[in-house]
């Protein structure tokens, strides 16, 4: 009889904005050392030079929502930032695609990460972005 370990957590790369080396693929799936976009923008806007991003499909048996997505942004210094915010990612991806179409080098892609008051939930903010 085989002792099979049941995995309670998994992260799979659903999309990467560029080809990743094996070491990068392994590192980007480990988000424990990634900074939360919500936390870094809480006290004011942050300007980040994002050079790549990854969409992760997460399965977590311990979570109320067992299957969800996380978005990981990589800056020019190798720092990782993450969020699960779909509205943030929609804004980010729209800007990224425009920059790609215009062939703007990643070294020149600066994003302003900030929070705005929610129109749907009084007293709450949400993280968003714009081109810096």
Model-assigned labels for residue ranges:
Residues 81-95:
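GIY-YIG-like beta-to-alpha core
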Residues 1-76, 120, 128-132:
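OB-fold ssDNA-binding interfaces and closely related basic DNA-contact patches used
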Residues 103-104, 113-132:
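Short, charged beta-turn/beta-strand-edge "cap" motif at the junction between a beta-strand
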Residues 91-112:
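Short nucleic-acid-contacting surface segments enriched for D/E, G, S/T with interspersed K/R
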Residues 7, 86, 90, 108-109, ...:
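Short non-domain terminal segments
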């Amino acid at each position: 009889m085989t002792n099979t370990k049941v995995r309670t957590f998994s992260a799979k790369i659903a999309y990467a904005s560029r080809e990743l080396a094996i070491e990068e693929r392994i590192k980007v799936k480990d988000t424990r050392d990634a900074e939360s976009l919500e936390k870094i923008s809480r006290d004011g806007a942050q300007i980040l030079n994002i050079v790549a991003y990854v969409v992760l499909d997460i399965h977590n048996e311990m979570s109320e929502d067992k299957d969800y997505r996380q978005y990981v942004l990589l800056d020019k210094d190798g720092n990782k930032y993450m969020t699960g915010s779909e509205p943030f990612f929609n804004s980010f991806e729209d800007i990224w695609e425009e920059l790609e179409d215009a062939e703007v080098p990643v070294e020149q892609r600066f994003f302003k990460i900030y929070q705005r008051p929610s129109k749907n939930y009084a007293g709450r903010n949400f993280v968003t972005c714009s081109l810096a």
